[in-house]
Amino acid sequence: LTLGQILAKERAVLYLNLESYSGFEELLGKKFPANLSDLFYYVRQGNENLIHRMNGMIQTVNNLDFIPPVRTPSDIRTVDWEDWERLLQEIVLHSSYEVLILDMGENGDEDFRLLEMCRKIYMPVLNDTLSVCKVTQFENLLRIWNKEKILEKTEKVHLPFHMDRISSDAYVEQLVWSELGDYIRELLRKERS
């Protein structure tokens, strides 16, 4: 979310939160009339005006466009690969967005296909024993499945903890100017040089 807001200052960015429990309605303090579940309904129907439908669902926070995430976990977990592929192709080929950010949770085997489509993958990691073991298991599975290309484009990031210093009423906007925002800007600066 912070990365998207920072990039959106210079480029057209669409943020898709694919987590089962995103907390977006609570975080932003409002209900959304349509969300990613509705968009996938149109994808499954083979709607020819998919980008037009999508544009009607777009919400914006701090210059960052996003489609509100699903409300129920099953809505994201039951999306077929063909539907993911069609949606992403439509966005890449027929929308005005230069950057598409997928904020992924844990949605099953489709995650690996989505990761294969990404140019860059940032993986937040922790240094505690259990977290390191989980990352190692993930990496080993990628090797077993011959998905080393995912590993090659993955950068592990140790994000600074930032929760305590940001007021709840403007949390999302304040992320950009938090310690996390500084960390992301430095990460992008290093990538560009």
Predicted regions and their residues:
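Short, flexible/disordered intra-domain loops and linkers
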Residues: 27-28, 32-33, 75-78, 169-170
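Cytosolic-facing regulatory segments adjacent to core modules
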Residues: 46-60, 68-104
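NTP-binding/hydrolysis catalytic cores, primarily Walker-type P-loop NTPases
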Residues: 170-193
